[in-house]
Amino acid sequence: MSQMDPDAVSKAFVEHYYSTFDTNRVGLAGLYQEASMLTFEGQKIQGVQSIVAKLTSLPFQQCKHHISTVDCQPSGPASGMLVFVSGNLQLAGEEHALKFSQMFHLMPTPQGSFYVFNDIFRLNYA
Amino acid sequence: MSQMDPDAVSKAFVEHYYSTFDTNRVGLAGLYQEASMLTFEGQKIQGVQSIVAKLTSLPFQQCKHHISTVDCQPSGPASGMLVFVSGNLQLAGEEHALKFSQMFHLMPTPQGSFYVFNDIFRLNYA
């Protein structure tokens, strides 16, 4: 990860994350680890199993994320990366899309990839 | 910081940050350091002097932030803290408030306080 352009890495991550979310939500398990944290609309969840259980139990089946902005910054000397996303979430059968903001803290793995250490999601109500 | 409740610390930080922004913007200098990064509506800025120059040159004088949500998570073993904020920004003379999302990565100082290492700000356009 450290050898790649951070903006390119974060954009690739964001595309991978939301396309997995929209097509095969259980596949998100590969992006979290036991120490991973998710705060979803204020609810705190920890660990890959609990996080995937939460994401797969959300009260909608079909959805489509549309990304508006992606910002990234290195998070410090441990070579993590912060990714900040804004966009819209379209649920099947709903007329209006929901606006959301989400941040990820990506940490490198020994294999040269990365995983989601921190994840905070909020809907932006009008 | 490590001895305090993270939710209490993040809430206190958020109140301090936005009240300083709304009443004495140049006073935000005390919260950043040379390594600090700000991404403001996609524009990347580094260092306390450049960050404060940006914040004090925004094209409005009077403003008032209203906070809707504050979420926080520890960012890793270095005992930093991620703070994720959503809210509204009311500018003087404008009828409608602007929705925004912002994230801060707070890092501890040797004096037991903390400073803003990462700061990403986005308006959430309707």
Curated annotation (Swiss-Prot), chains A, B:
This is Nuclear transport factor 2B. Interacts with RAN1. The modification N-acetylserine is found at S2. Keywords: Acetylation, Cytoplasm, Nucleus, Protein transport, Transport. The keyword Coiled coil does not apply. Residues 9-123 form the NTF2 domain. SUPFAM superfamilies: NTF2-like (SSF54427). The keyword Amino-acid biosynthesis does not apply. Transmembrane segments: none annotated. GO terms for biological process: protein import into nucleus. Expressed in roots, stems, leaves and flowers, and, at low levels, in siliques. It comes from Arabidopsis thaliana. One of its GO terms (cellular component) is cytoplasm. The gene is NTF2B. Pfam families: NTF2. Facilitates protein transport into the nucleus. Interacts with various nucleoporins and with Ran-GDP. Could be part of a multicomponent system of cytosolic factors that assemble at the pore complex during nuclear import. It is found in: Cytoplasm; Nucleus; Nucleus envelope.
